[in-house]
Amino acid sequence: MFRRLTFAQLLFATVLGIAGGVYIFQPVFEQYAKDQKELKEKMQLVQESEEKKS
């Protein structure tokens, strides 16, 4: 009466779900990485300018 999923079907659905999530949220991850890179560059510039003042 109750139909169960086989291990292969469950594994396929899991992989498909993870791949779909990565595809959907990829722009969010890219924007975060870009923001972090820009912030790191700004911090280096601030530190260099402070070192020059000293």
UniProtKB/Swiss-Prot annotation:
Quote the protein name from its UniProt record: Protein PIGBOS1
Principal place where this protein is found?
mitochondrion
Extent of the signal sequence:
none
The gene it comes from is: PIGBOS1
Topology in the lipid bilayer is annotated as: Single-pass membrane protein
Quaternary structure and partners: Homooligomer. Interacts (via C-terminus) with endoplasmic reticulum (ER) protein CLCC1; the interaction occurs at the mitochondria-associated ER membrane, a zone of contact between the ER and mitochondrial membranes, but does not appear to play a role in ER-mitochondria tethering and is not affected by ER stress.
Renumbered to this chain, region (Required for interaction with CLCC1) spans 30-36
Q: Report the protein's function.
A: Plays a role in regulation of the unfolded protein response triggered by endoplasmic reticulum (ER) stress resulting from the presence of unfolded proteins in the ER lumen.
- Chain ranges sitting on the Cytoplasmic side read 26-54
GO cellular component term, pick one: mitochondrial outer membrane
Topological domain spans for side Mitochondrial intermembrane: 1-4
Q: Which organism is it from?
A: Homo sapiens (Human)
Q: Which GO terms describe its biological process?
A: regulation of endoplasmic reticulum unfolded protein response; response to unfolded protein
Report the locations given in the UniProt record: Mitochondrion outer membrane
Q: Which residues cross the membrane?
A: 5-25
Keywords assigned:
Membrane, Mitochondrion, Mitochondrion outer membrane, Transmembrane, Transmembrane helix, Unfolded protein response
